[in-house]
C-alpha cells in the first residue's frame, strides 16, 4: 500500500493554534477522568478501606494479568447528573485480560452511595453485557451493591431496559455458552441477589459478602423475626446451607485469586482468524492529530491527515479516490489487523453515499472490520438533490451499514449531525464500540440552524397575526435555543448518557481501535449471503 503524503506544516501558526486548543480540551478531559476515578467522597473511601475492603480499581488491578491493557467503558457515565452524586455512575466496566483471555468486568463501587443503582448505572451495566454478548466475552461481576437507589426508583425498575434486563441478559449469555462469574464482596440485596444466583459460578467473601432478597429490616417488618446480615445471607449460609454460592473466600484478595482460577479453567475458544501482519507504528506521530484538527467543527480539514496518524506505516489503499470525494474510503492496517476505513470530507451527496455502500459491501464479503471516522453535517439538501434522489441513495448507505455483520468501530472526530450520524454508523447501527474526541459535537442539527428554523416558524406565526418582530426580538428567541444546543451537543453531555463508550484522547485512538478489533475477534464473523452490488 502507498504511504499517505501529509500536507500538514507542523511549524505553521494554524497547526500550533489547533494544537493548543486540543491540548486544553485534553487537559479538561483528564481532570474530569481523574476526579471520577477517585470514586465516592473521601469519607466513604476511608470507611471502605477501614473495613479491610479493597477499593474497586484496586480489585480490578489484582484481577487482571500484570502489564495488560484495560479497555474501560463509559468512565464518565452520569457526569454532571444526579447532583454529582454518582461519579462513573457508581460502577466500573470494561474489558481486561485474565490468564491471557479477554473478559468483561462489571464492578460496583460501594464508595458511591453504597454501590446502589442510579438509572445510568443500569444503562452502563446493560451496555457492558451487550459488549460481552456481541464479542463473546466471559463476564465477571464484582458485586458490592445495596440495590436500587430508591429516590430514582421510577427510572430503574419496570421498563424493558431497566434492572430486570440485567438478569435477562445473564440468562441469555449463559445459554450462549458465555461464562458468568459473580464475586460477592459486599452487599447483594433485593433484586441484586439474582446476579450471583444466576451466574455459572459464585464466590463470596466471609464476614463481608451477603446475599438476600430481603434484608434484616424487611424480614423483621414482614415476619417479626430478628436476624443479622450474616445469619440471613452470609458466606457460611450460602456455602454450607443454601448452596447459592460455590466458593468461600477469606477476604478480597482470596476472592480474586479464586476468580482468576475459575477463569483459568474456562475453556478458551479459538478466536476468528484475520490475516494479521506484524504491527507497525504510523510514519507520522499520532500526537500531530492535535494540530491537524481545528477546534471549530465547522472548519473543514482533510480526513486523510487523521488516517495517516492512526494506521500502520501511514499506508492507505484508497478506494474510488476520484468519485464521491466527500467521503474517503480505503483499506489499511491497525496494529496489524486489516480494516476498511470510511472518513468524512464534507456533506454526503448521492455519489458519496453510493460509494460508501459499495465499499461497505466489499468489506463485509471479505470479512474485514470497518472503522468509521465521523465528521459529518449530514446529507445534502435542496431541490436539485431531492430531485436527484438523495433520500434513495442515502438509504442505500444506511442499508449497507445496518446489514454489515463485520465488527464496526466508530470514532466521532468532529461533528455528528442528524442522519449523517446514522449513515456513519452511530450508536443505533451497532458499532461494537463508539468513542468521541473532546472537540466533537453531536446533535440533530447545528445550533445556528435550529435557532434559525425555530425563529422563522415564530416569525411566520406572528406575521399571520399581523405582528412584526424586530431583529432584537428575533435574537432573543434565538439565544436560549443556541445555548441549549451548545450544552447538549457537548461530548460530555453525550458520554454522561452513554450515547458513546467514552471520550478519548485523539492520540490514543489507534491503540483503542486495536484493542477493539482484538476483542471483537472472540466472536465469529458470519458469511455474507449476497454478492457486492456496484453502485
Model-derived features: positions:
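Ligand-binding clefts of soluble mixed alpha/beta catalytic domains
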Residues: 1-535
